[in-house]
């Protein structure tokens, strides 16, 4: 298993590299959003474009833009 912490990589650098890329954002509630990452701030507030909301693996809604409060975010995957 690779030890990621040995790289000493700042997560904000990773987040700035993936602006404009398709991402998956999972919330603490289990809801998943997929869309194009537009911005992330210091509080992990996230703005997505062309976003889709999934619950239990099923598409619930499609949004043009979605704004997600950072304290609800479990993880961001690119």
Swiss-Prot record:
Cross-referenced CDD domains: LSm6 (cd01726)
Subcellular localization(s) per the UniProt record: Cytoplasm; Nucleus
Source species, domain of life: Eukaryota
Any single GO CC term annotated in Swiss-Prot or TrEMBL for this entry: nucleolus
InterPro entries: Lsm6/sSmF, LSM_dom_sf, Sm, Sm_dom_euk/arc
GO BP annotations listed: deadenylation-dependent decapping of nuclear-transcribed mRNA; maturation of SSU-rRNA; mRNA splicing, via spliceosome; tRNA processing
Keyword presence, Cytoplasm: yes
Similarity field: Belongs to the snRNP Sm proteins family. SmF/LSm6 subfamily.
Protein name: U6 snRNA-associated Sm-like protein LSm6
Species of the source: Aspergillus clavatus (strain ATCC 1007 / CBS 513.65 / DSM 816 / NCTC 3887 / NRRL 1 / QM 1276 / 107)
């Amino acid at each position: 298993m690779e030890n990621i912490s040995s790289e000493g990589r700042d997560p904000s650098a990773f987040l700035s590299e993936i602006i404009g890329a398709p991402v998956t954002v999972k919330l603490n509630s289990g809801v998943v959003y997929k869309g194009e990452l537009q911005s992330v701030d210091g509080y992990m507030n996230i703005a997505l474009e062309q976003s889709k909301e999934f619950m239990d693996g099923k598409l619930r809604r499609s949004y043009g833009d979605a704004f997600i409060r950072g304290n609800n975010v479990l993880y961001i995957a690119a």
